[in-house]
Amino acid sequence: MSDNTLVSDYGMCEEEQVARIAWFYYHDGLTQSEISERLGLTRLKVSRLLEKGHQSGIIRVQINSRFEGCLEYENALRNHFALQNIRVLPALPDADIGLRLGIGAAHMLMESLRPQQLLAVGFGEATMTTLKRLSGFISAQQIRLVTLSGGVGPYMTGIGQLDAACSVSIMPAPLRASSQEIACTLRNENSVRDVMLTAQAADAAIVGIGAINQKDQASILKSGYITQGEQLMIGRKGAVGDILGYFFDAHGEIIPDIKIHNELIGLKLNSLSTIPTVIGVAGGEQKAEAIIAAMRGNYINALVTDQKTAGKIIQIIEK
């Protein structure tokens, strides 16, 4: 070890190690090898602590460029739909759009959530990917979680990645009951009602947005909560998308007289209005109409999407 060693591995808490490593790496331009020598750590540990710093939110990278986040699209959509927040991810050919959306949504939440705040989560692939990317931040900031709907299975791919000590309130009921009567009974159970009330009191929420034209790729269909026949019928009634299983038309109006709406267990879309920030996470040009409808219905007031989808949205609203 050289004379450049400033302090031993045992002389700092982990958070201080992360802060020092981040400063040396990003501010002073030192390599990981130089940092490991200076702090008396292995290079592998330096690399792991940098990654932990990103996951926990201690390290946040800001890119100052006119291309970052497709600012032109962001400004246009923010102004048109009066959004609180928006992030448009630059196009990246051959990249996993679901993974990129989850990372983008995780970054938005890291910027807005404060320690020990309550985050309400809807089911879906995009929201579960977001939770996976947030796992370190949730633990470090003691963020509490609550589900917005019934059903354990749809949430486990995300919640299952969290530290066992994380506070998670899961609605003890299926997402869809077999009849309206059973759904009504379950909604009136104290344990279910308590979780619903907790969700309504959340500081922020994150939801996916489904599109009726996704057909067999729609999460709600793949999860078995509706049949292909129901999907066709709902589409014929004018639905363009759904949030939490509630289907709406191009103007954001809930489609009336749909069986599933009476059998769902969880927050209704109008109940989301009690939550200060509701982030919609969705991408793919086929979802453009559904995203527009969700914003027109005021079900979301923040959005994470990709560049191509944002361009399609602007093309539609400017017609």
UniProtKB/Swiss-Prot annotation:
For this protein, the record's Gene3D superfamilies field holds: 3.40.50.1360, Winged helix-like DNA-binding domain superfamily/Winged helix DNA-binding domain
Give the UniProt record's GO annotations in the biological process aspect: regulation of DNA-templated transcription initiation
Q: Give the subcellular location.
A: Cytoplasm
Q: Which InterPro entries match?
A: NagB/RpiA_transferase-like, SorC_transcr_regulators, Sugar-bd_dom_put, WH-like_DNA-bd_sf
Q: What happens when the gene is disrupted?
A: The deletion mutant displays completely derepressed expression of the lsr operon. The mutant imports AI-2 faster than the wild-type strain because of high-level production of the Lsr transport apparatus. The lsrK and further downstream-located STM4071 genes are also up-regulated in the mutant.
Q: Which Pfam families match?
A: Sugar-bind
**Keywords, ordered alphabetically:** Cytoplasm, DNA-binding, Repressor, Transcription, Transcription regulation
The annotated modulation of its activity is: Inactivated by phosphorylated autoinducer-2 (phospho-AI-2). Phospho-AI-2 acts by binding to LsrR, which is then unable to bind to the promoter regions, allowing the transcription of the target genes.
* Stated family: Belongs to the SorC transcriptional regulatory family.
PANTHER family attached here?
Answer: TRANSCRIPTIONAL REGULATOR LSRR, TRANSCRIPTIONAL REGULATOR-RELATED
Q: What is this protein called?
A: Transcriptional regulator LsrR
The organism named in the record is Salmonella typhimurium (strain LT2 / SGSC1412 / ATCC 700720)
